[in-house]
C-alpha cells in the first residue's frame, strides 16, 4: 500500500487542482493493467521530481507552484486551462519518463535495459553507435500509459492536457546528450563510440520553463464548442492543436495576475512572499523579483533583519575531529508587505 499511496500523493494531490478526474490516479490503479504496479514507485518519484522542479523554476514568480493550490478541490468549475496548467502537465509527464528511463538503464526492471538498437551503426564522421544508451523508448511508453490514461475527458481541456503531456516527454528527448569514448592507437581517437544519455533534470526543467515563457494560446472556434467556453467545450476539431507545435506548450485561458489572494481559485497572492534584493550570485530575473512580486502588485518591500548562527573558525584537531566556533551575524531579508495604514492596491487583472 505504501507504493500506491506515494503514487496517489505525487500525482493525485499535486495535480488535482489542474485537471480534475484527468489526474485521478486511483481510477488508473483500479482499471489499469496489474503489471504496471511494478512501476508505481518510480512513477511517484518521477511525478514528485517534476513538482520539485516546478517549485524551483517558479520560486521567484507570482505563481510559485504552491502546495495548497495543488491540493485544491477538483470541482469542474475550478479546472483551469492556463499556461501554468500546461507546465504542470509537461513537467510531471517528463519527470515520470525521466525516472523510469533512469531506473531502466540501471537494471531496476527485469523487462528492460540499455537501448542498443543502433549499436554498430555509423552515426557520423569518425564515430559509431555503441555503449549503453538510455532507453527513452521504454520510459516514454510507461509514462504515456500511466499519465495519459488518467485523462478521461474529450473536451478541449483534455486535448490540451494530452498535448502538454507529450510536449513534456519530447523535452526529455530534446535535452539528451551524446557521450563518446575514444578508440585508437596511443589514444589517437581515430574513431569514437557514442551513446545517448539523459541530461540533468535541471536542464530539462530550464528547457520546459523556456517553453512556458513562449507557450501558445489556442483560439478555439466557439461555434463548435458547447456552452461557448473554450475550456469546457466539446466537439473540438482534431486540427485545433497543430502537429507543427507538438513540442510547444499550449493553453486555452489567460492567467490571472496572481497578485491578489483568491482562495477559492487556489491563488494566494504575493503578500508575505520573500524576494531578492541586492543579492550576489543571482540572475537578473531573481534580482527583479521584489519589483515583480511586491511593487507591481501594489505592495511595498519590507526589510527584516534576522540573526543567524553558523559554524565558523573551524580547525582540524589530531585525531580526528573538527572543532568550530558558533558565530552570530545579522542578515537582511526582504518581503512583500502592505503599506502601513493603507489598503492594498490590487494588481490589475486579479482573479
Swiss-Prot record:
Its main location: secreted. Pfam families: wnt. Keywords: Developmental protein, Disulfide bond, Extracellular matrix, Glycoprotein, Lipoprotein, Secreted, Signal, Wnt signaling pathway. The keyword Signal applies. Residues 1-24 form the signal peptide. Palmitoleoylation is required for efficient binding to frizzled receptors. Depalmitoleoylation leads to Wnt signaling pathway inhibition. SMART domains: WNT1. Glycans are attached at residues 103, 262, 281. It is found in: Secreted, Extracellular space, Extracellular matrix; Secreted. CDD domains: Wnt_Wnt8a. A lipid is attached at residue 186 (O-palmitoleoyl serine). Disulfide bonds join 54-65, 104-112, 114-132, 180-194, 182-189, 259-297, 275-290, 294-336, 312-327, 314-324, 319-320. One of its GO terms (molecular function) is cytokine activity. InterPro entries: Protein_Wnt-8A/8C, Wnt, Wnt8, Wnt_C, Wnt_CS. One of its GO terms (biological process) is secondary palate development. GO terms for cellular component: collagen-containing extracellular matrix; extracellular region; extracellular space. Ligand for members of the frizzled family of seven transmembrane receptors. Plays a role in embryonic patterning. Forms a soluble 1:1 complex with AFM; this prevents oligomerization and is required for prolonged biological activity. The complex with AFM may represent the physiological form in body fluids. Belongs to the Wnt family. This is Protein Wnt-8a. It comes from Homo sapiens.
